[in-house]
Amino acid sequence: MIYKPYNLKDVVKASEQNKFTVVSTFAGGGGSSTGYRLAGGKILCVNEFVKEAINTYKENYPDTPVLPDDIKTLSEKDFSKYGEIDIFDGSPPCSAFSVSGAMVQGKHSKGWGQTKN
């Protein structure tokens, strides 16, 4: 198997195929979005509320709407207004949600909304 490095032009070209639609939550700088785009997916919108991650995402994909709110405040209507959703992707940060960590009962306090230095 030959490894082919991709650049952003390759990603944009592949995503123009529009084989399926995606909403991505906990989007970070766009890693999952890049994979979906390379597979021919169209990203309808993403959710991310960490400012540094939003800035990175917008730098990578300036035409994709970013919902900059805490996901706990969003509803299905906030996402579905961008079109019919084939894949709803969510990849929350493990340290804030893992039950093996020392979470405060009923709260996702450990690392929630914090950036790593």
Where are these regions (language model features)?
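Conserved active-site and SAM-binding loop architecture
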Residues: M1-N117
